[in-house]
């Protein structure tokens, strides 16, 4: 167990490699109850929330979700999050659910409340008495269909619905989302139902997975970790998340002027994928070199159990961000050859 954002979290259960391969080949489950979950209710909650994110939330409808980011005034990323459109409550009110990172949960919640409550929205912390579980892997959806008796094949990526699972007291908020690069679902449910479901899944032989496998899986899929691969000093264009910025929409949002300027001038750095020669692993903050001169910094790195190669994410100048570019990473005082590659490193065939 290790401390993480005020929680005690398991690094591994049976072993990182075994857990990683279980998710890639079959199915693994994660307790992700450390994540923050907020429900916003009131008149037109998507329009109100739009002022905080650069992605056009009106592109999604009830039962759909959008990955996006919260920004500061300089266009830096406060956090990344998923916004779930939960549709209408009645003729005058709608609801959205947002899932935020554990390390940012307190500051995000205060910041969102400060801006949403004056707009007439009620902000409720759903973590009180609730848990989040993630089922990830090619067998995740078939297993949920067995447990619920429902056909989930039509639930699209980033789709969500309430699902009644056998043995649980209440229907479960079920979203086809995840942080592994595999198919799967994330479930929001009551604490007592969470314990029941976790125990039942263990009895069925589902592999429990810890933070170690969660990190190697997300890194193979080139999914960002907030605080490492992006932070308040990084804008979406630098982080390879420019596709989240919809400057064509008329709505104003925090950080828009700064992002308009960056879109016109180009980013000062770019996040790239690196594959390293040999077995040496690049870690956070290791220097990236070009012709022996430091030009960038590694943000995340690991040994890929799937590819059996050392991989990393790093920021480098735009001129050096082209796939195929030869660079090196300084590891324990020695320059290890590395090549810029396209992200993600792994994508399910």
Identify the meaning behind each predicted range:
Residues 1-68, 76, 212:
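Acidic, proline/glycine-enriched N-terminal capping motif
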Residues 58-62, 70-76, 82-92, 114-115, ...:
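Short, charge-rich binding segments
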Residues 1-3, 8-11, 17, 86-349:
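Conserved, structured C-terminal
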Residues 37-41, 59, 72, 83, ...:
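Short secondary-structure transition/capping motifs
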Residues 43-79, 140-170:
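Internal amphipathic helical hairpin motif
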């Amino acid at each position: 167990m290790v401390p993480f954002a005020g929680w005690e979290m398991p690094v591994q259960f049976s072993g990182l490699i075994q857990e990683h391969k279980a998710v890639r080949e079959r199915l693994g489950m994660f307790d992700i109850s450390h994540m923050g979950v907020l429900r916003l209710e009131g008149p037109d909650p998507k329009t109100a929330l739009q002022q905080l994110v650069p992605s056009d939330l009106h592109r999604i409808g009830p039962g759909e979700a959008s990955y996006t980011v919260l920004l500061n005034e300089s266009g830096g990323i406060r956090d990344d999050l998923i916004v779930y459109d939960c549709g209408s409550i009645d003729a005058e009110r709608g609801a959205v659910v947002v899932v935020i990172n554990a390390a940012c949960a307190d500051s995000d919640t205060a910041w969102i409340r400060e801006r949403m409550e004056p707009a007439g929205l009620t902000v409720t912390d759903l973590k009180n008495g609730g848990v989040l579980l993630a089922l990830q892997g090619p067998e995740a959806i078939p297993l949920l269909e067995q447990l619920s008796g429902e056909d989930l094949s039509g639930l699209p990526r980033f789709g969500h619905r309430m699902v009644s699972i056998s043995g649980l007291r209440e229907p479960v908020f079920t979203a086809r989302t995840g942080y592994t690069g595999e198919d799967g679902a994330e479930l929001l449910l009551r604490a007592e139902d969470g314990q029941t479901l976790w125990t039942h899944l263990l009895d069925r032989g589902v592999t429990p997975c810890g933070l170690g496998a969660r990190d190697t899986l997300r890194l193979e899929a080139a999914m960002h970790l907030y605080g490492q691969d992006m932070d308040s000093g990084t804008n979406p264009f630098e982080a390879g998340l420019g596709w989240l910025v919809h400057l064509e929409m008329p709505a104003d949002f925090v950080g828009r002027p700064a992002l308009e300027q960056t879109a016109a001038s180009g980013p000062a750095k770019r996040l790239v994928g690196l594959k390293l020669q040999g077995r040496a692993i690049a870690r956070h903050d290791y220097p990236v070199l070009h012709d022996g001169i430091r030009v960038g910094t590694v943000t995340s790195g690991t040994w890929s159990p799937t590819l059996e190669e050392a991989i990393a994410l790093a920021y480098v100048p735009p001129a050096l961000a082209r796939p195929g570019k030869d660079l090196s990473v300084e590891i324990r005082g020695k320059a290890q050859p590395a090549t810029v590659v396209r992200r993600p490193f792994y994508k399910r065939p």
